[in-house]
Amino acid sequence: MSTREIRIATRKSALALWQAEYVKARLEQAHPGLLVTLVPMVSRGDKLLDAPLAKIGGKGLFVKELETALLDNEADIAVHSMKDVPMDFPEGLGLYCICEREDPRDAFVSNRFSSLDALPAGSIVGTSSLRRQAQLLARRPDLQIRFLRGNVNTRLAKLDAGEYDAIILAAAGLIRLGFEERITASISVDDSLPAGGQGAVGIECRSADSEIHALLAPLHHTDTADRVVAERALNKHLNGGCQVPIACYAVLEGEQLWLRGLVGQPSGGTLLMADARAPRASAETLGVQVAEDLLGQGAAAILKEVYGEAGHP
């Protein structure tokens, strides 16, 4: 294969740059002599930090500019946090690589309290996620949830300034940025089911670029990919493209996938849960099956209410 340059479109946040540098290093390791460069960009989601994601269009805000760069041939691949990747791709683009997953759990971070259960009634907890909010309030309705956006450093600084008693972040982001010691406690997936794809990094590129597909192949982690395919299929069947209180998490048990799904009212008043098992080759079908179970329990009404509040269909 001819040596060529690969240009990586990435957001400018510290975590996005870490992920892009990780992919760059993996590509250079797999293909000595390959020139890999970063094309940092500012996404609309990075500019609009004063409103909840659900109200400004959801997580697709973080990828649109990167996709435009791919379509305009200003970059060859785009590196994303899988939990930020919308279900559908523009014509001519697709997801061609999913890297090995980091810790998928949510992390409890506090300077004063050792765990969620140790928080006194009325404590202020920061999160930007309706998924986390729904599960937190279902478990601890006596807590106050306060909106929290910004990059990891900004969120930690707000905690350190005393604006919150605790904040909830993805463990993977803290670990990757070297803040693992800030994790007061990792929250079990039984207590806070993660977002689909949480902890995994995905690589998007042009569908017709077979040479790039071949270069990416050594980075693809099949065990992670099968799990994420099931999670994304559940999300897609629930039309979970926006920032909504949907959680899903798949694990491999030998050659079987076990998928758990959850839809909750942001108030925590109702949490709907479903799970099922299937051969890993049926990952997508499994996602649809668990989503159908949730719909049968009334998930559509909860999601419609949330979409209505966010101003989306």
From Swiss-Prot:
Question: Has keyword Transferase?
Answer: yes
Protein name, per record: Porphobilinogen deaminase
Does the keyword Transferase belong to this entry? Answer: yes
Function noted in UniProt: Tetrapolymerization of the monopyrrole PBG into the hydroxymethylbilane pre-uroporphyrinogen in several discrete steps.
Miscellaneous comment as given in the Swiss-Prot or TrEMBL entry:
The porphobilinogen subunits are added to the dipyrromethane group.
Record's InterPro entries? HemC (IPR000860), Porphobilin_deaminase_cofac_BS (IPR022419), Porphobilin_deaminase_N (IPR022417), Porphobilinogen_deaminase_C (IPR022418), Porphobilinogen_deaminase_C_sf (IPR036803)
Single GO BP term? protoporphyrinogen IX biosynthetic process
Lineage summary: Bacteria, Pseudomonadati, Pseudomonadota, Gammaproteobacteria, Pseudomonadales
> From which domain of life does this come?
Bacteria
Q: Name one GO molecular function term.
A: hydroxymethylbilane synthase activity
State the free-text cofactor note.
Binds 1 dipyrromethane group covalently.
Q: List, alphabetically, the PROSITE patterns matched.
A: PORPHOBILINOGEN_DEAM (PS00533)
User: Which is one Gene Ontology cellular component term of this protein?
Assistant: cytoplasm
The UniProt entry, under PANTHER family, shows:
PORPHOBILINOGEN DEAMINASE
Subunit text:
Monomer.
